């Protein structure tokens, strides 16, 4: 009898914990209704109507040399193309520090449409990421590359950001390729510190920040 009671108690405990875990997962993922993560980019792209409502999409990409990982991030910001371009190319502005994922940021050099910046992220304290960003105003494209991958524990990290006018707003398409130990785990980890959290936060931060700064960048 005692053995049966013990088995029933264990079964009840496991069921209760399983339900609790499921509830937590539903709650956590329910906090991100305006975002979508999928395996592959559909042929017709994300829903433009949902993009206009503020939804952001992330899709997995296969790197060109089949090494490492890649992603494409797509979202829309409520700002004209010209104003948003000025916002994205203002590499030395203090407003970047209002992003909770950035703890330090400085411009090392900025001339001839090539900017070298150093950024320390909250998720990797003490590590300076030195980025080179090449601005192409005629095509509204930004090409970026991590210049010190070894110091950041990476093999490589590069990509580009393409801006496109959509009515009175701007569509942002960011593509990146990277590789480092644990890249697959980082890419699929859904909470703080993972790729999805980082990208969704960056997109949301821009969507909320640029409308407040339109007077500065128009």
Summary of predicted features, one role per range:
Residues 4-23:
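Bacterial N-terminal signal peptides that target proteins for export
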Residues 21-33:
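Bacterial N-terminal signal peptides
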Residues 36-111:
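Hydrophobic ligand-binding cavity/cleft-lining segments
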Residues 64-68, 93-153, 178-179, 204-218:
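Glycine-rich portal/gate segments that line the openings of hydrophobic small-molecule binding cavities
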Residues 68-74, 141, 158, 169-173:
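Intrinsic-disorder/low-complexity, polar/charged segments enriched in Ser/Thr/Lys/Arg/Asp/Glu/Gln
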Residues 72-75, 105, 128-135, 158-165:
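Hydrophobic/aromatic beta-strand elements that line small-molecule binding cavities or substrate pockets
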Residues 78-82, 109-112, 134-140, 162-171:
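A short, structured loop/turn motif at beta-sheet edges
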Residues 148-200:
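Beta-strand/loop substructures that line and gate deep hydrophobic ligand-binding cavities in soluble
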């Amino acid at each position: 009898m005692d053995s049966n009671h013990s088995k029933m108690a264990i079964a009840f405990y496991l069921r209760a914990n399983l339900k609790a875990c499921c509830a937590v997962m539903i709650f956590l993922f329910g906090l991100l209704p305006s975002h979508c993560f999928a395996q592959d980019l559909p042929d017709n792209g994300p829903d433009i109507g949902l993009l206009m409502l503020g939804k952001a999409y992330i899709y997995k990409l296969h790197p060109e040399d089949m090494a490492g990982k890649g992603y494409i991030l797509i979202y829309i910001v409520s700002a004209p193309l010209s104003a948003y371009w000025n916002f994205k190319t203002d590499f030395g502005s203090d407003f970047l520090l209002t992003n909770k994922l950035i703890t330090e940021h400085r411009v090392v050099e900025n001339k001839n449409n090539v900017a070298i910046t150093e950024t320390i992220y909250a998720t990797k304290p003490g590590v300076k990421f030195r980025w080179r960003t090449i601005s192409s105003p005629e095509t509204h494209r930004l090409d970026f590359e991590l210049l010190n991958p070894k110091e950041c524990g990476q093999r490589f990290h590069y990509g580009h950001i393409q801006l496109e006018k959509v009515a009175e707003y701007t569509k942002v398409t960011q593509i990146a390729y990277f590789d480092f130990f644990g890249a697959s785990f980082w890419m699929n980890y859904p909470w703080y510190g993972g790729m999805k959290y980082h990208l969704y936060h960056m997109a949301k931060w821009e969507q909320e920040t640029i409308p407040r700064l339109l007077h500065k960048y128009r």
